[in-house]
Amino acid sequence: MTHMPARPVDGAEPLSALPAGPMRQAGTQRSGIYEISKVLTAPARLEITLANVVNVLSSFLQIRCGAIVVLDAEGQPEIAATGDIPPSSQSAARGVIPKAVIDHIATTGMPLIVKDVSKSELFQAEPQPPWSSGTVPISFIGVPVKADNKILGTISIDRVRNDAAPFPADEDVRFLTMVANLVSRTIRLHRFLNLEGRRPIGEQERPEKPIIAQRGAPGRHPPVKIDGIIGDSPALQQVVETVSVVARTNSTVLLRGESGTGKEFFAQAIHELSPRKNKPFVKLNCAALPEGVLESELFGHEKGAFTGAIAQRAGRFELANGGTLLLDEIGEISPAFQAKLLRVLQEGELERVGGTKTLAVDVRLICATNKNLEMAVANAEFRADLYYRISVVPIVLPPLRERPGDIPRLANALLDRFNKENQRELTFSSSAIEVMSQCYFPGNVRELENCVRRTATLARSSSIVSSDFACKNSQCLSSLLWKTDGSPGGITVDGHARSNVMPTSSPRSGGSIGASDEVSSVKACDPHGSGCPAMESRLTQRDRLIEAMEKAGWVQAKAARILGLTPRQVGYALRQHRIEVKKL
């Protein structure tokens, strides 16, 4: 597709000519980016994901209609997603936005701003378009969705024009451009998976499901297995499937998730499954070192570069040459160091501290963070260009509370490890499994491991029972590490409000119960109480079960996927809580 410089069109004005509207509150844009990031990381078909993005845009911008159009290799509309019109293919795409408008944005590669569509020839090419409102004046803003200077599609909004109010084009274009950058990476990932035969793009006949094949489903691939990764929940299998695909490439991966979800473990798995598996795997925690030391650790230093530099030393980039480098806690590095790191990532070259010789490095980069980088970018705490450089393939690791069905298998595996290390033969009773399955585990798998080890160490017999757990003896202090507050997410984890930590792995509007939904029904626990920090209340479990069943139309198999359980477990829980299944 040929790119041409932007040219004025009838009824459209260049961005600089339009009066700058009043600045929207930064918090609104941050919240919008945060919600959109949650939608984009959720497992769903591309057209469903894009329709959800438009719905979020509609809730954060005062617009009348919004649309995202994805173009195929020939530049023709392939998918059109709107908030109020079901997503469809090429024929409907031309009806959502005039083809001339799509072509103009794709050809120029620039935003298109039209203060009054009735005065623009671009909007008169097709009679009675669905966005027409008769004599009501409509303004339009559209931006391209780009990736590596290639146009993948467009994002556009329109609103009823109010001559008495300023036209906030500048702010809208900036916000939509940020959204377009996020959307472009999702489109590229879906297309990559499509080429791998994993997930057809735009396929209408398949129901909305994660890309992971369900065990035993006819005509579907069996779940992918990675050594050491335990669990069959849909949330975890989605991650495993994505990891198995991206590992075969050299694409930069951004692992996101709360502390204790296994980011370093998955980074190691990506390396072991990659063509670089026989080369070094080097890791560094960026938050553990001051900026000056961090620069020396990553880039190396020459002899005499600073006090104490008594010999030349290779940095982590050099040590990982030909292999994989994991930068953990990437969100904690300073803005000054971000610029230095960006240069190395862009050029593949570096100089040691105190040196002048340029060294070329070939490294596959994996970054990890539990920080909300979108909010950090909006707050000017994290460089946007570095964010786009490291977030080529973002993978959100689900917290343990989103896959409670995996807790029994995880606990038994951790106990087996403890037994081998200590020459013991301990087992869990059914009551012990029930206690762990009801715990919230804000520290995720790491906290579960600590719980298993502590309980196994103090167990009174070879069979661990419920009374052996610290929470049953008013000795569990985990609740002191988190508390409810007034934040949108409702709790504090790792010292941050949930809304400031990470996008969850599923959108609030999607089929699964996200972290925020679970947390909203959980109250802070008394550290001196008799139960685990959360989810110990039968009332809370019952409410969550009913909510999932209602979302699933009272179909147990669908509710099981929402809760990360098996249909048999859901059926048992329904009987246990004496919930009558509705016949719809």
From Swiss-Prot:
Gene Ontology BP annotations: nitrogen fixation; phosphorelay signal transduction system
Transcription listed as a keyword: yes
Annotated segments matching region C-terminal DNA-binding domain: 542-584
Residues binding ATP: 257-264, 320-329
Residue ranges of every copy of the Sigma-54 factor interaction domain listed in the record: 229-457
Record-linked Gene3D superfamilies: 1.10.8.60, 3.30.450.40, Homeodomain-like, P-loop containing nucleotide triphosphate hydrolases
Domain of life of the organism encoding this protein: Bacteria
Residues where a divalent metal cation binds: C471, C476
Region (Inter-domain linker): 458-541
Chain residues forming the annotated DNA-binding region: 556-575
Domain GAF: 45-187
Keyword vocabulary terms for this entry: Activator, ATP-binding, DNA-binding, Metal-binding, Nitrogen fixation, Nucleotide-binding, Plasmid, Transcription, Transcription regulation, Two-component regulatory system
Chain segments carrying region Disordered: 1-24, 495-518
NCBIfam families linked to this entry: nifA (TIGR01817)
PANTHER family: PTS-DEPENDENT DIHYDROXYACETONE KINASE OPERON REGULATORY PROTEIN-RELATED, TRANSCRIPTIONAL REGULATORY PROTEIN
Role this protein plays: Required for activation of most nif operons, which are directly involved in nitrogen fixation.
Subunit structure: Interacts with sigma-54.
Name this protein carries in UniProt: Nif-specific regulatory protein
Designated gene of the protein: nifA
